[in-house]
Amino acid sequence: MINLGSAEIADLRVGASQVARVYLGEDIIWQPNFDSLPAAIYFSAAGYDDTGAGTQAAPFKTLKMANAVARAGKTLYFRGGDTFTGTLLARPGCIYNSYGTGKATINSGNAESVLLDNADSAQVRRLIAQGSGTTVNGTHGIRAINSHAEGIQIDDVVIDGCEVRGYGRNGIFATVANYPSGLTGLQITNNIVEDCTQNDERGHTGGIIVAAEEADFWGLATHPASHRDVVVTGNTVRRCKGKRDAPNHVGSGIIVAQTEGGLVENNLAEDCGENSTNQAGPVGIWAWDAIGVVIRKNTVLRQRSARSDGGGFDLDGGCKNCVLEYNFSMGCTGPGIIIFSFDDTAYPANKLLDYSGNIARYNLSVRDGQTVRSEFGMFIGTMRPVASDFQNIRVYNNTIVVDTVGAFSPTCLSIQTFGGVDFSHATGVIANNIFLQKGAGLLCDVRTTAMQIHSNCFHSVQGTAMRSFGFDWETVDQWISASGNKEFLHGTHTIFVDNPQLVNDSGTNPEDFRPADDSPLYGVGMDINAEFGIARPTEDFLGNALPATQVFFTPGAMEPDTPLPNLLTSPNVLNTGWELNDIDLISGLLGMFGGTSAQNIRVDAEGAAVGQLRTFTAGTEKIFRRGGFVKPAADVIAAVIGNRQPDINDYWWTWFDIVAGELDDADAWGAYLDSVPRFRMQKRPNGFWLIMHEMKVPSTWTQDKFWAQPSAPHPLRGGINEGLGRGLIHDGFFEFRVG
């Protein structure tokens, strides 16, 4: 192409004679018909640049010709199975694709395969980029760059369906030469990147990277994001191992940084990072210095690092309102999930946005943390000494399963700081997760009193310790007290410590880590929207719908296929199967979700209650979880649930203050004295509370009675006594067998 200023030359003459062709060396760079070529221009290894017409019947031959004839609106087709040598220089508004059988290969040797420099709306599709080798080539495979002056954006670049192999730096790299110029609407989709990143002395390498040049243009606290609304979906990254002794992280799968708004979805990264030796290690798929990036439904397998990091997924320093959800990692040397804010104050000033509003939910990590420097299933922490950092972090409904692998026994959950940073300013919620420790490592290591930690399943198969601020505790009560009342809310423990009974906790398929249909986990999770105002998504890890009117909540990334059956007769309406003792009135009222299913129970006589006789087969001990959904009316401030053994009149009852919102008292007689292992009280919508306790039925019993009643203050002890209140609204009772 020949330009006069910014305009392309359409006609070139010497005197009165039109120039037929212009060469640069032996390469044709212009001829008069270039502007009149058809919309589809074809290239083949069997074609001719001199005599070709750019048609499928008479194609051109070389990439140099392609670089010369490209005009906005043209589609350039390269014959599948053919190899073209050199570098393709993508032009704005052009589409580059293969035709025929298979994909065309661009063999770029030691150079880049495709360069999209200020290539607005250019599309590169279904091409193979082949470099001279990951330890020989020193460039990127496909590079999209905005080299405009400050503030100009390049829109709608597409890199789709390509295969990239044998490049020493990044496989696919989207970057800028000046900030805040960048790429808007970039799409990197359905590509395969293999065997790259092993010849870059500087580090910061990965299979696919969307970022500014990190040495100069990072830090969204100091300038706008370079990139906006980026889409990275359906890609596969393999064996991007990095270069040993590089001064920074090398060998990540996918990185998105210096970006506002983005989706990273349905990608696979495996066997990357093996050569990483720097303290700042790689991660399979991660974001940093980013706003509103969503990383979802991706898989990372066997991510490696010889030192730190080496994990599956990471929201790192400077992330704001970013999301990790529905991701699966397995067999990584570092944590499956990393929530971390690094120290930018040494560069030399704060360049990062405060780490805030980030979410990790419905992710699955299996047997990660297989190295001494990053021996964790999930890691949450900071080394940034900024009091406004690490705010409103939400980590919920993840499943983290660790085991001893070789010499490594990772801690299932670690929450800590580095460099003496005070973590007391951190805020956030860690709830409804499963932390399953199968090996010899710690169950958890928590070094903060600031974050809310509730309704998680912590279970160690080998009975390993729970650590708090460097001290190991053998009992849950000790750990809860030492850790600042973690897992203690509304006067009751919220922790669940029994085996979650997953389908196959030694498996490799994500579905193996779903709670079995008879798992005791069912219903012990909290309603995080009612408790903390956290909006829940519409599906779990496996795509099962999470109804907006859900009543029972289960920890972990997956719902059971089948809920535990409610064993009560007529659990929502007090008629068939219920005994109504001295009940003055039962009437329908507004339920939890705006319906009219709730009933108002009014009583006048002391001891008035509703009850249901339960019968079962003797011979084995049984554990039942019993409770209901209640809220106060009239002069009621409490609800009582209990059990009676009719033959010998042994009983257990539990009082819940449903005005103050806390467990008030419990009492027992006879065989029930040691039979109730746990209580639970949780918020529900519209002022309702879930109240429940678990109780053991001795093997000799064939019946007992579940009962519930309203209650009012006792005038003598200032507490609560049974059967003196009028007006308890209930929206259903339940009984589950959990053992």
Identify the residue ranges that each predicted region occupies.
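Extracellular and organelle-lumenal recognition/adhesion modules and their flexible linkers in secreted
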Residues: 11, 27-28, 562-739
